[in-house]
Amino acid sequence: VDEVGSRNLGVLLDTYHMNIEEQNIGDAIRLVGDRLMNFHTGENNRTAPGRGHLDWDEIFRALSDIHYTGRIISEPFVMQGGEVGRDIHVYRDLVENPSEKTIDAEAKYLLEFEKGMLKKYFVD
């Protein structure tokens, strides 16, 4: 990114993949620093943040440390079927009794979880 030198080129980080590849997600975020343009959140098990084992306090602390102001895009994959479920090979439902009501509850949980993290690390 630095060698290209374009303000239109940056880095996208994804916590699901970082969980597999990085020794320390917070350190990786800090290393990327102001080159971070987009940030995808998803748990180690592809569910909503807070439903797995990732250290979300460290992740949001690192985003705060680099003064991140870009997009945060959540990518929980919670049930089989559909184009996305087929494309990423979701082989089992990740929520009990998937239904519109359950999915709505998961979406509400995710929104409240991430809003809480943003308030904790970004709002004075």
Where are these regions (language model features)?
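Histidine-acidic metal/acid-base catalytic patches
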Residues: V1-D124
